[in-house]
Amino acid sequence: ISNKLSEDIDEMEKMLNEYLQFASSTSSEKDELFDISKTIETLIKKYNNSLITLNIEKNITFNGRKNLMVRCISNVIDNALKYGKKVKFSIKKLSKIIVITIEDDGPGVPKSEYGNVFKPFYKINKGRGDSKSSVGLGLSIASDVVRSHGGKIDLNKSKLGGLSVKISLPF
């Protein structure tokens, strides 16, 4: 019982720290013009994972809060790697939007849960494997970041069999 209680306290502490870190960064960071393609490419290289395939259109600039966008993309990639092995990442610029898509080959999320996964502290346990390290904030924070930039985030079934997360950002 003591071990379980200790794990629960550690998980609660992790939840609070993640949320506080997110809350403090949203109020202090200013918009800047940056090369989102290069930023994302640098981020993905840090994962050092040969099972992440990239299709990145070069030289896409975006005016926004760079650190928050990195946090947003990291959260989605972390989720994809937690539940899947293969991850497919793409970024492209269309006429008025930047589209970022992250797909994985994991168990996916039931369509009935799509809206719920954006709720803070919500976790899906059925069929998603062990979620001990999950606090249920990753996609919630990603959604908040995207919406704060005037964008939208959508979930679908991935062609790889798992989840596809599509982020659309205006520019």
Labelled PLM ranges:
Residues 69-73:
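A residue-level detector for a conserved hydrophobic packing site
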Residues 109-122:
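Short conserved segment of the HATPase_c
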Residues 138, 142:
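Short alpha-helical Gxxx[C/S/T] motif in the catalytic ATP-binding
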Residues 25-29, 61-64:
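Conserved micro-motifs of the catalytic ATP-binding
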Residues 104:
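Acidic ATP/Mg2+-coordinating residue in the GHKL
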Residues 53-67, 92-95:
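Conserved catalytic submotifs in the C-terminal HATPase_c
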